[in-house]
Amino acid sequence: MIQISDTAQTHFRKLIEREGAPGMGVRLSAVDPGTPRADARLEFAEPSDLLGDEWAVDCDGFTLYVDAASVGWLDGAEIDIVAGTAGAQQLTIKAPRIKGEAPGDAASLVERVHWVVENEINPQLASHGGKVAVQEVSAEGVVLLRFGGGCQGCGMADVTLKQGIEKTLMGRVPGVTAVRDATDHDSGHAPYIPRGNAA
């Protein structure tokens, strides 16, 4: 079930009335669902824009159309208008399932490690233009990683590995015993902090 606040409904209704297009509604869809890049998209939709398989949610003065392929990812979503900075109003969409759910305890160690790397670690490394890929997870729980992007050749890669990645994986994934770096840092082309420049 998708919840759209009265404030958000009033906001959309006013915008639609201003457009004056008969039958115009709002379409909601999930973009890249089940990935760390997942996002929700809201757009105005005229009847000719609709595919016909959308789920329709009756609102006050318009219809919210939910893309059929996105329904499962958007279940439990909340659309609202909240007070932003300097008194401005801001549209918010909270979709707790859009990025997928962490694998359960029954999932393999490899699946759980991959999920934490893709959904928690890589989004943080992306702020520096970096990433990390899981090369191997041994039966003993040793995770072998390969850095890329701005992390490959970075003078702080060892710190990132020990204080960030290893700490996160060992704290979030029972069964991980150690994390090792398999990266050829000498071949890094654009490190975030060049080796030798790290404090």
Swiss-Prot record:
[4Fe-4S] cluster binds at C151, C154. Its cofactor is [4Fe-4S] cluster. Binds 1 [4Fe-4S] cluster per subunit. The cluster is presumably bound at the interface of two monomers. Keywords: 4Fe-4S, Iron, Iron-sulfur, Metal-binding. One of its GO terms (molecular function) is iron ion binding. GO terms for biological process: iron-sulfur cluster assembly; protein maturation. It comes from the Bacteria. Pfam families: NifU. Belongs to the NfuA family. Involved in iron-sulfur cluster biogenesis. Binds a 4Fe-4S cluster, can transfer this cluster to apoproteins, and thereby intervenes in the maturation of Fe/S proteins. Could also act as a scaffold/chaperone for damaged Fe/S proteins. PANTHER family: FE_S BIOGENESIS PROTEIN NFUA (PTHR11178:SF51), IRON-SULFUR CLUSTER SCAFFOLD PROTEIN NFU-RELATED (PTHR11178). Homodimer. This is Fe/S biogenesis protein NfuA. It comes from Stenotrophomonas maltophilia (strain R551-3).
